């Protein structure tokens, strides 16, 4: 069964890839569907991986820290879980006047499947909320 440690490691690798400038094609390797979209539940937006690449390209010094995550087993074959939890996220606008740093607690709701290769893949990726800290730079998604 997929474990919380595996989910955290998988999520950390995805976040590190995005923060390092991963292309949409490189990000797609983390998804079961190479044309996946990221769903932003709190405002109704959906973001293609191409748009996700462009969005993150404007920031520097991105950092993600996992908060608490719960797993709900969904299926044994293929092996799937629903992973819900929080991630503290910060990223800096290099050319913007202060405040430059986005600081937010982000709600994550993911369906993850173990592929035949053994690798984990996002089946569904939803951001359920972005709680911006009082000293955060504004962000319009």
Predicted feature locations:
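Short, low-complexity N-terminal intrinsically disordered segments enriched in polar/charged residues
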Residues: 1-30, 34, 140-141
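Soluble or luminal CAZymes and related metallo-dependent hydrolases
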Residues: 6, 10, 51, 104
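A solvent-exposed, acidic/Ser-Thr-rich amphipathic alpha-helical stretch
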Residues: 4, 24-25, 29-80
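A beta-strand edge to alpha-helix "cap/lid" segment located at domain peripheries
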Residues: 54-141
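Short N-terminal signal/transit or membrane-insertion segments
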Residues: 11-17, 44-54, 137-141
């Amino acid at each position: 069964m997929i474990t919380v440690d595996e989910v955290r490691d998988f999520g950390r690798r995805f976040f590190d890839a995005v923060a390092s400038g991963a292309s949409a094609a490189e990000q797609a390797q983390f998804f079961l569907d190479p044309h996946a979209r990221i769903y932003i539940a709190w405002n109704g937006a959906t973001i293609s991986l191409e748009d996700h690449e462009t969005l993150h390209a404007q920031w520097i010094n991105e950092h993600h820290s996992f908060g608490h995550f719960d797993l709900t087993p969904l299926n044994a074959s293929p092996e799937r879980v629903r992973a819900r939890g929080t991630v503290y996220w910060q990223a800096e606008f290099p050319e913007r006047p202060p405040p430059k740093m986005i600081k937010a607690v982000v709600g994550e709701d993911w369906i993850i499947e173990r592929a035949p290769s053994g690798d984990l893949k996002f089946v569904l990726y939803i951001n359920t909320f972005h709680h911006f800290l009082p000293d955060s730079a504004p962000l319009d998604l």
